[in-house]
């Protein structure tokens, strides 16, 4: 990525812990998508070396003829490219190599963001399973209590039935939470290539938002990759134009015919009649127009992605701060008040169940809010092109 972004945002607040960086670095080393991108880059580098060379090698020819006089000749011929041709091909290949180098950075950042987001979803899933288990136990205990109170005639049949339904719903929600966790662990295992382990957890301390005004969108890897693709397409026009110029073939031969020495020089030049190369030039120009449009799309997409992820993270972080400031304590206090009101007979069984469900729903929403905020943070780092700097993974 560009040095401007690295200089401005290389150390955003909330630097990743070393343990998390070590896990991600291990995943990156073994990731097949990154390995494939690295292989494509190596292939492009090799092609760039070959693109600057002449396409044709010298040819050696031996001719022998026996008639009244024996004739033998040895010759060497070479198709000579105009010197601008290899240079034009080399420049176009260099641009494609630069594009793939930026695409490799882009792939790495996408993989790292996906891995970090996967960690968050697994951590969130485990927290939701723990909460669902607590809900199941609470509802089960209350259903047992309601059944006893019903037998003693203290509550109505409908109230006891409501408690049993709530307990059943809690069991179902716990099963759903277990399934969601299993799916999250499966997706993460597919991404990391290892079976579920003690993945890292994420606390409620969210980093401060990035100042996206410091981000130079033109230096983001996705934009740079598109820019070099356009540059390569522009240079391919020159390649196609030079390919229209015929390459002469020059040859020399030496031999003998009977007792006489033979020496000859030959020069041949193709006549571009059947294929003038105009269609290749037209195609190259069309490809250049397409690459220019792709660059504009990449610029627009990167700018929108950066702006919207920043807005989304700021909104989620503000909600998280508000929850920690007032909502979390309010839920704990309300749970105690609710239990005292039930014990004192101030509320009935059904009202107690409704309010208790609301408290559990609020806690579940807070878990989801925290997970969404962390995912948005990692997406913001990716959008700003600094997720590798934040996590501390070396390229």
Outline where the language-model segments fall.
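Heptad-repeat amphipathic alpha-helical coiled-coil interaction surface used
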Residues: 36, 41-43, 48-50, 90-92, ...
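Amphipathic alpha-helical coiled-coil segments and their boundaries
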Residues: 23, 30, 37, 79, ...
């Amino acid at each position: 990525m560009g040095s401007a972004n690295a200089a401005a945002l290389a150390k955003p607040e909330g630097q990743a812990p070393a343990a998390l960086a070590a896990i991600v670095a291990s995943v990156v080393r073994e990731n097949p998508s990154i390995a494939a991108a690295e292989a494509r880059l190596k292939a492009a580098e090799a092609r760039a070396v070959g693109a600057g060379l002449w396409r044709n090698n010298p040819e050696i020819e031996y001719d022998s003829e026996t008639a009244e006089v024996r004739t033998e000749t040895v010759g060497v011929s070479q198709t000579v490219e105009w010197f601008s041709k290899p240079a034009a091909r080399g420049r176009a290949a260099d641009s494609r190599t630069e594009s793939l180098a930026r695409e490799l950075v882009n792939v790495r950042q996408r993989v790292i963001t996906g891995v970090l987001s996967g960690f968050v979803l697994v951590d969130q899933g485990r927290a939701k399973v723990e909460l669902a288990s607590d809900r199941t136990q609470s509802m089960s205990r209350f259903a047992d209590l309601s059944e006893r109170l019903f037998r003693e005639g203290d509550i109505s049949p409908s109230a006891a039935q409501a408690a049993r339904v709530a307990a059943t719903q809690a069991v179902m929600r716990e099963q759903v939470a277990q399934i969601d966790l299993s799916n999250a662990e499966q997706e993460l295992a597919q991404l990391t290539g290892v079976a579920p382990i003690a993945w890292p957890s994420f606390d409620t301390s969210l980093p401060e938002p990035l100042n996206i005004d410091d981000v130079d969108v033109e230096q983001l890897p996705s934009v740079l990759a598109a820019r070099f693709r356009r540059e390569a397409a522009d240079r391919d026009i020159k390649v196609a134009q030079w390919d229209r110029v015929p390459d002469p073939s020059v040859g020399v031969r030496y031999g003998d015919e009977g007792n006489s020495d033979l020496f000859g020089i030959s020069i041949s030049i193709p006549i571009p009649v059947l294929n003038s190369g105009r269609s290749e030039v037209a195609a190259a120009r069309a490809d250049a127009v397409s690459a220019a449009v792709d660059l504009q799309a990449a610029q627009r997409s990167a700018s929108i992605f950066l702006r919207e992820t920043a807005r989304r993270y700021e909104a989620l972080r503000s909600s998280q701060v508000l929850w920690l400031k007032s909502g979390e304590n309010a839920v704990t206090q309300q749970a105690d008040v609710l239990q005292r009101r039930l014990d004192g007979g101030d509320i009935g069984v059904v009202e107690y169940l409704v309010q208790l469900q609301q408290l559990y729903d609020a806690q579940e929403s807070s878990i989801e809010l925290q997970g969404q905020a962390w995912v948005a943070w990692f997406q913001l780092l990716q959008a700003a092109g600094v997720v590798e700097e934040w996590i501390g993974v070396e390229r």
